[in-house]
Amino acid sequence: MTSLDYVHAASIADAVALLNVPTLRCRPIAGGTDLVVAMRQRGPWFDRLVDVAAIPELCEIEETPAEIRIGAAVTFARAAASPLLREVAPLLVQACLSVGSPQIRNAGTLGGNVINAAPCADSLPPLVALDATAHLAGPEGERTLPVSQLAVSPHHATLRPGELLTHFTFARMPRGTRSTFIKLGRRNAQSISRLSVAAAGRTGGAGVVDFVRLAPGAALPHTDRMLQVEALLLGQTPSPDLFRAAGELAARLMIDITGRRWSTEYKEIAIQGLVEQALAAVFGADPS
């Protein structure tokens, strides 16, 4: 049986130091819901686990004058129960409530879900739709990048050696914005997303769309906003026909990027329907 060094970090600086011992291959752990499964499947590929779950800065949800801040070790359950997130990011709360089982939501963290970079990760579409920024700390200092540029391909995050994801930030969306997260899985509970959509938007005084964001999950090699679909919607009056056109465009864009494969016939129809439903929920119109 492989022996592992397991240490607890008391601060971000402590964690970075513990992760950067030249003679050891180190890995951070918080909830472990993905990492422990991977260890059981393939065996550990590191010598040391650095537990960061108790670092105060990684567990906070707060609002500053400029932005919302969510620590990377915040669990799905804590995020879902946050009054602040229920107010400013209901699409993220919906996504957190859809994750796995209560046991997984109580242990799994937003940061771990993003760093694992699974295309089906439930937190990625809402964070991308929120235009969230990821904050990282490492031996060379701190840096930031959009969440959409952190998880760039299936199970590959653009972390530099010895870096730690510390928190996410995003600005409040414009007043009057509504949002939603819709997930399609094999069953209602403990389901891995086959497809999902996070959407946010509002209409202005003239009754036309003046703000919209749309990010599908498990549809593309990595989660990103569909800017062409957003452009189609901006300046238009919400209607079932508009939502249908947006859904059709989303399906075409998905196929253009991924090509046709055995699952395309199903996903083409499914992503179109999810986009229509999400836009109807955001803009308050019946998609049928």
Question: Which residues fall in each region the model found?
Answer:
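C-terminal structural segment of proteins
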Residues: M1-S288
